[in-house]
């Protein structure tokens, strides 16, 4: 589908963004292992999260789903059934990587695959550490590409040092460790999204988290983990599109309601504040294990900044739209230490640089990020999402301040993480 967007005279509105994608995945995957039933509201009914539900159903988990409400009938830590067919994760890297950990210690064989994009993405980052724990995984390119074959076996505890800051790798290891024969200690680069740690602790798992290590004690009691009913907060990665839209527009005020403010996810807010954005956070509260609030951003001038180091794990998915903010800012912005961008749904360094260049921005790709000159005026153009949901939405935001019309190919990609994106897009322009 092609979507045509154009310059907006002003932007106004209050938006409830869909539920957090990371938490939605975990809410169904973890509750499938619980002894009992869980009610989940605010669930993101995007294509990726629906892939997690589909895979769990193939292993005997009963799940009722209607819009943003889900009920999971847990089967217990060792109650999953061997699937009779290949588990298709669609385009969802989270589904594949978390299931790889979850299934590593289950007493059966399983095969994980996905669409062409997912099958092309490297998987050694999870396969190698899981193998070190005793897991038996194989796949194309010596396990670096899906389909992945998992022969469930005994997972060994012990010490493992994480070489990269990745919530998916960390989560895969912790899920494998739930069925382990001894405690697991993770050290190294453990600072990344911590939804897994928060949720497992809330479900009664003996997990200790310190600045330099995470220690998991496999549950010895048969009723652990407990089921966890929860409301999923709004996704800060989705909210960032509206934060940037407001920040780059001279006549804008947009509020995102009920957004998750977990410190491991608020890197984009920190960057926008450093760039000079006018941001107000109100109605702060806790919902379950997660901090939540309302975020209002008003239009104003931005300046260039540097995005690197410990910031990267806190905003890796938001870099495409932050690049739009940087293109509209005064001065240079440097993105570094973000090699992971090249292993996403697309090579997001290459796609961001090519598509924003087509709109008149000045960018230079680097091995681990990009350099954005800033200061230019964006022009409408015919651009490609490359089937990547975050690229499609970033280009739509750029189109709000570009002169003339912008035509986005494969605009339907937004449904992966934000099924109502185009409705909300029209809403803020019409307000």
Curated annotation (Swiss-Prot):
Keyword flag Transmembrane helix: no
Gene Ontology MF terms in the entry: 3-phosphoshikimate 1-carboxyvinyltransferase activity
Keyword Cytoplasm in record: yes
Listed GO CC annotations: cytoplasm
Main function: Catalyzes the transfer of the enolpyruvyl moiety of phosphoenolpyruvate (PEP) to the 5-hydroxyl of shikimate-3-phosphate (S3P) to produce enolpyruvyl shikimate-3-phosphate and inorganic phosphate.
Family classification: Belongs to the EPSP synthase family.
Identification of the protein by name: 3-phosphoshikimate 1-carboxyvinyltransferase
Provenance organism: Herpetosiphon aurantiacus (strain ATCC 23779 / DSM 785 / 114-95)
